[in-house]
């Protein structure tokens, strides 16, 4: 594929130079690079038909793809579209039980032992670093970055899958974190609908307006501290400098946590904090402030007040969209997280499942075409968006109670894809704004990509974090201890990981 592109460019360059020679009587100047617009130029009629870009669809090959069997209804129409576009690439499907934690790692280990690894893995939501360290994954650096369409993929979506300067995976299913707003309550309380580029000051003003005798401003502000510990270029949440591979809770998390603590100190602002202190079994006491205001209904459901019209907003994520559509008794929509101030963008946290080629992939060129189709490719995304847009809200996946997805968030910011996403009748104005905010995306699920995450954020560290969130300790007092614990553990995990990758 690359060879004929080079041949086309050289032929066109020669034709143009000959034209200059005949017109001006000058010797053509030798050059090693074709003009910038050569790939868009129409070839001269030489009697021979030049290869067309569409010839990539004539590529031959065979690809075996493995995916969680619970996602069959979602992926099969997308694979059928690929087969129609690439009729000479055989796609063999291998569904497997991939719904449990560690299922992907276990499946790969089993197929390695049987010498039968698939060529492509799709929708891996497990810890990815161990798969790289085990040598299960193919380096796609050259395949990806030599493709012009790769420039439309924000670096925040590929950086997490880059180890030792090599890219090993691509995001294939993405969910964004943001705010969900009760549109009915906005009207009832005569609150002006905020813009999607709102600031933290506007957010605070609005959430306070949601406090009445019967309602709260927020059902939950969970994750607000994590999100605002990473509102800067080069950071993931919580408070992780991924360039220097170091956590900084003291300088990044403390200010964010202090802001959250101030909001939670406002009487009646957040239902979540009204449940604390909880009982030893982690249930809400009947003597709690929550029960005093709302009764026992939903006392242990963090989103109950939002679902039932008793809260103006809540922090949320699109991975909750399925049950939100099923259970919410109000009209609602998404908003991006507010900007820190008017001079900064919103760095929207994303949760991502990935897809990748395996190290035993027999035909990387053909397999990469399918990988591209399922991840960032423009044509694959446009066709997949059409497939999802054609669905009606309320359709279930097979015999399950799971609703079919009526939209998905593409992992590219290509203008054609962005426009197509917004045209979907199932995509609301707020959801479109949330998707557009992904130009500046940060990872909110670093447990999937940082080696040994669970050994870093162990019970001791989580207890320290929760003591602050529940109002039992001060962030500034606890943060240095957290930094010392997590950075020491991180250094140990990185050393072990890098040693294994380098073997």
Region spans (language model):
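Extracytoplasmic ligand-binding clamshell segments of periplasmic binding protein
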Residues: 99-103, 220, 235-343, 347-348, ...
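A structural signal for short loop-to-beta-strand junctions that line the ligand-binding cleft
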Residues: 109, 119, 149-185, 214-219, ...
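Helix-loop-helix "hinge/cap" segment bordering the ligand-binding cleft or interdomain interface
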Residues: 84, 145-146, 162-283, 359-365, ...
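C-terminal lobe and pocket-closing loops
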Residues: 324-328, 343-349, 357-459, 501-502
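Hinge/lid segment of periplasmic solute-binding proteins
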Residues: 48-54, 123-176, 333-336
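Short, well-ordered beta-strand elements
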Residues: 54-70, 89-95, 119-120, 168
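Extracytoplasmic "Venus flytrap"/periplasmic binding protein-like
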Residues: 81-155, 187-190, 303-313, 326
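Short, polar/charged alpha-helical segment
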Residues: 51-57, 69-90, 457, 461
């Amino acid at each position: 594929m690359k060879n004929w592109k080079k041949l086309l460019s050289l032929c066109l360059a020669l034709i143009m130079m000959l034209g200059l020679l005949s017109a001006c009587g000058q010797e053509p100047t030798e050059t090693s690079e074709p003009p910038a617009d050569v790939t868009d130029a129409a070839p001269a009629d030489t009697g021979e038909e030049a290869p067309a870009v569409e010839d990539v669809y004539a590529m031959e090959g065979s690809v075996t793809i493995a995916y969680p069997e619970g996602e069959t209804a979602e992926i099969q129409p997308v694979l059928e579209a690929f087969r129609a576009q690439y009729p000479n690439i055989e796609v063999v499907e291998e569904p497997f039980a991939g719904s449990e934690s560690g299922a992907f790692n276990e499946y790969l280990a089993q197929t390695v032992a049987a010498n039968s690894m698939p060529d492509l893995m799709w929708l891996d939501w497990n810890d990815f670093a161990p798969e790289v360290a085990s040598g299960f994954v193919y380096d796609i650096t050259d395949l990806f970055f030599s493709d012009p369409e790769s420039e439309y993929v924000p670096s925040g979506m590929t950086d997490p899958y880059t180890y030792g300067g090599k890219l090993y995976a691509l995001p294939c299913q993405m969910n964004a974190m943001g705010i969900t707003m009760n549109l009915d309550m906005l009207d009832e309380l005569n609150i002006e609908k905020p813009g999607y580029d709102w600031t933290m000051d506007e957010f605070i003003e609005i959430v306070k307006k949601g406090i009445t005798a019967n309602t709260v401003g927020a059902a939950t502000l969970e994750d607000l501290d994590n999100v605002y510990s990473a509102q800067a270029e080069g950071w993931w949440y919580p408070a992780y400098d991924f360039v220097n591979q170091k956590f900084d809770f003291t300088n990044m998390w403390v200010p964010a946590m202090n802001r959250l603590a101030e909001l939670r100190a406002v009487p009646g602002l957040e239902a979540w904090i009204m449940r604390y202190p909880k009982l030893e079994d982690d249930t809400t006491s009947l003597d709690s402030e929550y029960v005093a205001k709302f009764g026992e209904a939903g006392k242990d459901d963090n989103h109950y007040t939002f679902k039932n019209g008793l809260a103006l907003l809540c922090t949320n994520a699109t991975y909750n969209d399925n049950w939100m559509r099923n259970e919410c008794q109000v009209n609602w929509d998404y908003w991006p997280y507010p900007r820190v101030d008017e001079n900064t963008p919103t760095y929207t946290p994303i949760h991502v499942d990935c897809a990748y080629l395996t190290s035993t992939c027999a035909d990387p060129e053909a397999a990469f075409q399918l990988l591209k189709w399922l991840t960032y490719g423009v044509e694959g995304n446009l066709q997949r968006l059409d497939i999802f847009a054609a669905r009606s809200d309320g359709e279930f996946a097979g015999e399950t109670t799971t609703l079919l997805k009526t939209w998905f968030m593409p992992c590219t910011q290509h203008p054609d894809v962005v426009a197509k996403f917004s045209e979907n009748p199932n995509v609301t104005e707020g959801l479109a704004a949330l998707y557009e905010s992904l130009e500046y995306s940060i990872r909110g699920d670093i447990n999937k990509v940082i080696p040994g995450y669970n050994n870093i954020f162990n019970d001791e560290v989580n207890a320290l974090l929760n003591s602050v969130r529940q109002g039992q300790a001060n962030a500034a007092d606890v943060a240095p201890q957290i930094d010392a614990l997590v950075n020491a553990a991180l250094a140990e995990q990185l050393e072990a990981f890098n040693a294994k990758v380098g073997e």
